[in-house]
């Protein structure tokens, strides 16, 4: 018993005298380690009488706990002293200017999308949205593209199963609106669309804005006037615009729209920017709209394409690489 008291006193004295964590670790190993002084006492329990053995074992364990507690307290005390000393030698000049946080900016695709939406909202169009995972009916059949129609080959589609796809355009939003809303209808449908394509001018996911206007006595002249005005406002220029015949299953007649662009050498050329046309009567009828009473037009454009033209970006993939050197230019 006396030996235990002496060892405990020596251990506590050694802890109190330690001036560093490494010194405390040495004390811990010397008294509490596998070959430590207090641990050795437990190995001598066999030499203690059976009557005194439980009490002696308890006293040794309590001594070990006491030493460990003092080591922990001493470590905390040393850490606090070190921090106080560090703070005492460091000063902060509160008169110095703070480091301002760099302000982020909108992505160029977002900027372009908002620019398009702002124009069409300004002339009375509402913004409509719909699911990106679509059924075959709304993505194809309701748009006059039945199964095995040659036009399906125009679009490389991501299929979940034979009747469920990632939408290849935002036209299904127009169909769903026509199914639930009676004319007059005046909407644009911005959103992500998906096609199996990837190169300098195509990505598997990109953004479209499609528009739809249905009312009585709507003509191609209305479509032409709105698109001419939109292109002039978007590009901030009085553009030369060309409307030429094309083919889309959901419009008749179908038109592709080109604008005249001038390159760095001063050479002019036509560049396709969007597709449009008068809504096919069959599409109106399939959505429950009387094609004898109502007519309408639809148009669609790729947002990234407009962003590339506006910001003079040559490679579409740069919009999706998250390179801050590129994105910081649009702040």
Swiss-Prot record:
Binds 2 magnesium ions per tetramer. Mg(2+) binds at residue 252. It is found in: Cytoplasm. It holds the Pfam family tRNA-synt_2d. GO terms for cellular component: cytoplasm. One of its GO terms (biological process) is phenylalanyl-tRNA aminoacylation. It comes from the Bacteria. InterPro entries: aa-tRNA-synth_II (IPR006195), aa-tRNA-synth_II/BPL/LPL (IPR045864), Phe-tRNA-synth_IIc_asu (IPR004529), Phe-tRNA_ligase_II_N (IPR004188), Phe_tRNA_ligase_alpha1_bac (IPR022911), Phenylalanyl-tRNA_Synthase (IPR002319), tRNA-bd_arm (IPR010978). It catalyses: tRNA(Phe) + L-phenylalanine + ATP = L-phenylalanyl-tRNA(Phe) + AMP + diphosphate + H(+). The keyword Ligase applies. One of its GO terms (molecular function) is magnesium ion binding. Keywords: Aminoacyl-tRNA synthetase, ATP-binding, Cytoplasm, Ligase, Magnesium, Metal-binding, Nucleotide-binding, Protein biosynthesis. Its EC number is 6.1.1.20. Its cofactor is Mg(2+). Belongs to the class-II aminoacyl-tRNA synthetase family. Phe-tRNA synthetase alpha subunit type 1 subfamily. HAMAP family: Phe_tRNA_synth_alpha1. Tetramer of two alpha and two beta subunits. PANTHER family: PHENYLALANINE--TRNA LIGASE, MITOCHONDRIAL, PHENYLALANYL-TRNA SYNTHETASE. NCBIfam families: pheS (TIGR00468). This is Phenylalanine--tRNA ligase alpha subunit. The gene is pheS.
